[in-house]
Amino acid sequence: MVHSLKWLGIFPLILFQWLGTTSSLNLEDPNVCSHWESYSVTVQESYSHPYDQVYYTSCTDILNWFKCTRHRISYRTAYRRGEKTMYRRKSQCCPGFYESREMCVPHCADKCVHGRCIAPNTCQCEPGWGGPNCSSACDVDHWGPHCSSRCQCKNGALCNPITGACHCSSGYKGWRCEERCDQGTYGNDCQQKCQCQNGASCDHVTGECRCPPGYTGAFCEDLCPPGKHGSQCEERCPCQNGGVCHHVTGECSCPAGWMGTVCGQPCPEGRYGRNCSQECQCHNGGTCDSATGQCYCSPGYNGERCQEECPVGLYGVKCAQTCQCLNGGKCYHISGACLCEPGYTGERCETPLCSEGTYGMKCDKKCPCHLQYTQSCHPMSGECACKPGRSGLYCNETCSLGFYGEFCQQICSCQNGADCDSVTGKCICAPGFTGVDCSTACPPGTYGVNCSSLCNCKNNAVCSPVDGSCTCKAGWHGVDCSINCPRGSWGLGCNLTCQCLNGGACNPLDGTCTCAPGWRGLKCELPCQDGTYGMNCIERCDCSHADGCHPATGYCRCLAGWAGMHCDSVCPGGHWGPNCSLSCDCKNGASCSPDDGICECAPGYRGTTCQRICSPGFYGHRCSQACPQCVHSNGPCHHVTGQCDCLAGFMGSLCNEVCPSGRYGKNCAGVCACTNNGTCNPIDGTCQCYPGWIGNDCSQACPPGHWGPNCIHTCNCHNGAYCSAYDGECKCSPGWTGLYCTQRCPLGYYGKECTLVCQCQNGADCDHITGQCTCRTGFMGKFCEQKCPSASYGYGCRQVCDCLNNSTCDHITGTCYCSPGWKGARCDQAVMIVVGNLNSLSRTSAAIPADSYQIGAIAGIIILVLVVLFLLALFIIYRQKQKGKDTAMPAVAYTPAVRVLSTDYTIADTLPHNNVVNANSQYFSNPSYHTLSQCTTGPQVNSMDRMMVSRSKSSQLFVNLKNLDPGKRSHTIDYTGTLPADWKQGGFLNENGLLKNSAYSISTCSLSSTENPYATIKDPPVLLPKNIECGYVEMKSPARRDSAYAEISNSSLANKNVYEVEPTVSVVQGAFCNNGKISQDLYDLPKNSHIPCHYDLLPVRESSSSNKDESTSE
């Protein structure tokens, strides 16, 4: 099988063949025909060559060591030479045509006499001529020899004068041209095809389209325009409300939200969409848009389907209205009505029940709030509600840095170190910035606070937008950059040293040297070459018998025996002529020619007798040198030396150098007196003082409260901050921070630069300056680490508790927590416990006067003894019936933790023997308990062997549980159920108010609470078949306080756990269960609770340790 072909050397052959077959015919000529012709070429091709492949495989052949030989046909690639048939295209004139001037023209065998050849052997005759070669002529209605036959052509067709054949006019066909063109064709010989679309008919002569109803356009390609339909789109659509009519029938297609023949009926309520086919999904009384289905919510709701109540703080339609409730009042999401917190009343909860500045149950406590910054003091708790911009326990602090507004919860948007107004959030921009958020730098030319100051920088210096200080360009210095760099320095800040030598001037911008006359080189280190002198050494010496000329002035240095300006005279000075006998009349040191006595003027002079100086702007020999460009001078250069006459404060050959630092005046002869980095003006010696200094010599500091150049700015620092005289920056005193030291240290910090960490505890406020702690109500100590001592409470622990009968007092509010047997606000009312069932509950006794306490106590003891005797009798009967029965029961086990505030409890399979109370136990938080109403049957566990109750020295109550032999537990039933955590446990009291010899049971009870905790119970016993009446105690958990503890022994792992029971105040109700087999146990209650006859079972869930034990036992 051939997989691929590799052509070698084929392309040159193909190219040659193609060149040989091409011609000059125009291939686009419709009369040019082409055909493919074949030819052969030799190629090398690859193919798959089969071969026999031997391989080995495992098999059961013992003789060959379980190895067998196998064969299979495989393929590999091989190459061979062969012939390849190729094809090439060849073009020539089609049959009936011949080539003429690169075109294929038709050929007629008989020459067309009165016409032209239009197709092979076909002539197109001129009007009035006919025949195969257009040589015959007859009138329009006749044909044949002598034109004797009459033409039979119809519809205006012409007949051939020779044959009588009809030549049909446009739109007709047939032997006599009596037939119209077929459908879909038109024109001459019916050769044209109609272009009409959408079923339109075509005129057989012209091809014009006749559109069907619903279409228009030259080819009927367009639908009727909107609002029109029918034949020629002349009928008007009747559709309403944006309905679209069918372009043919006019039937209306309604938009979403409308229905009916003409779309005139809106969707019925609860429906929407096209044809009203979809059902609205809006909740809470919301209505939906009939077109889109979008929900329009009723007041108080929002969300895509109106399923959400308004967020807290908003109410009404679209939740667009803001609640007006004050002082923590709750706002009704529909109408905005306020539900006030305790202590407030009024339509908006704006009226406190206590007068201003007081709080408490009797409005007798003074609010600790700073009234100036306090919105309100809670009339019940005394809690301070701060005004916007204030925070802290007593509203004595401003918002932390970066926050503002109510509760200091809004984040400031200020940038570039700006302060934020703690009330409004308005940005107080730092100097150099402006804008709402201080994000914009001051415009060029301005600086300072609010960009209100104008810069005073010269010579394109950059002005700091913060303090207006000038950053000079290269070559300038001074407070306002108005002074060139002093002599010998250049560059930025005039910090670079000039390298110019021999009196060369240094450019203060780039440090380039301008050499004095007579010197050259980059650093003016080279004298002029021999024979040259002057500026840039461009002048030529004019000396005859001299040892060169002076490089600066050009004076000739005459050789011995020669004199004169050019050293060309042997006569002594002032003489000339033969024997030097004639006297010269030349002035100003000129010499005269030894030959003719003409004056040769000294440099700087001119005239016949050299009595005149050079014209302004020129100097030197023959006054031919132009003065240099003097920068700071009184006029043109000196006529002799070319030296510039510098103004005060300048020096150098071109007067382009400022006096050296510390000098000023004409020829820099004055000595500056400026101090404290003041800049001396080189012209008159006046001082430009550095910011923060004033005075003629800059020796006086700015007076307090002022800063900047000439001390023109006023400081804006607060709270004792130090103001920098240079830039006005505030150095805050301890306890303050911010741009102008207007903000206290952030919470938790104090002291210098707010770097010290506060040590206050229990939510106490920390003084931002000293770090001293201001304790919250109920705490005291240096760091507020101590609760108020016993019998005191409140702010500063200055209020005395008013609780009686060994009751405890809340260290914050002073609320009394009564000891067992007492109730009332001051625990001054005794309580009598009466036992009954759920259907006939006895009420607690009325309040007993304090002076009748002993009588009530004796009566209670008597009743208690009777109850205990009755329970003992029942217990004896119960024990007799329980003998021989299965004693297995679940035990309460607790997941170990360290003071865990959760409800992780587990019911294990059974209680083991010999459980011992361990005093070193972990703690668990007591859960909330609920009022038990009608009980339903729960799983029952029978036969607790013994329950012993003892009281420890620390007044804590302990329950010691001991089970019977765990080997007697039934293994026939093993299931896991999930039960509510509020299944109850009941029991009876003995003479000591404790339980003895009681069974253990669980029952489910309906709750008025909305909480729904669950626990997993492993191996529950068989459920009882009937309802059980149970006694109960309502247990409620107020604020967490110190409490007594009950210890429950755990399983065989000996993990002992203690759970914390919070103080409770509740109505005590008693009951006993009608079924004698269902006796109940009781956990000990805290010392400040009433004695119950029933206690809630702790919420339980299966623990990992319990599961591990179960798997081991199984």
UniProtKB/Swiss-Prot annotation:
This is Multiple epidermal growth factor-like domains protein 10. Disulfide bonds join 33-94, 59-68, 93-104, 108-117, 112-123, 125-134, 147-159, 153-166, 168-177, 190-202, 196-209, 211-220, 233-245, 239-252, 254-263, 280-288, 282-295, 297-306, 319-331, 325-338, 340-349, 408-420, 414-427, 429-438, 451-463, 457-470, 472-481, 494-506, 500-513, 515-524, 580-592, 586-599, 601-610, 668-680, 674-687, 689-698, 715-723, 717-730, 732-741, 754-766, 760-773, 775-784, 801-809, 803-816, 818-827. Residues 25-856 are extracellular. Keywords: Cell adhesion, Cell membrane, Disulfide bond, EGF-like domain, Membrane, Myogenesis, Phagocytosis, Repeat, Signal, Transmembrane, Transmembrane helix. GO terms for molecular function: scavenger receptor activity. It comes from Xenopus tropicalis. One of its GO terms (cellular component) is plasma membrane. Gene3D superfamilies: Tie2 ligand-binding domain superfamily (2.170.300.10). One of its GO terms (biological process) is skeletal muscle satellite cell activation. It is found in: Cell membrane. Residues 29-106 form the EMI domain. Residues 105-135, 143-178, 186-221, 229-264, 277-307, 315-350, 404-439, 447-482, 490-525, 576-611, 664-699, 712-742, 750-785, 798-828 form the EGF-like domain. Its main location: membrane. InterPro entries: EGF-like_CS, EGF-like_dom, EGF_PEAR1L-like, EMI_domain, LE_dom, MEGF10/SREC1/2-like. Membrane receptor involved in phagocytosis. May also regulate homotypic retinal neuron repulsion. May play role in cell adhesion and motility. May also be an essential factor in the regulation of myogenesis, controlling the balance between skeletal muscle satellite cells proliferation and differentiation. PANTHER family: MULTIPLE EPIDERMAL GROWTH FACTOR-LIKE DOMAINS PROTEIN 10, SCAVENGER RECEPTOR CLASS F. Residues 1-24 form the signal peptide. It is a single-pass membrane protein.
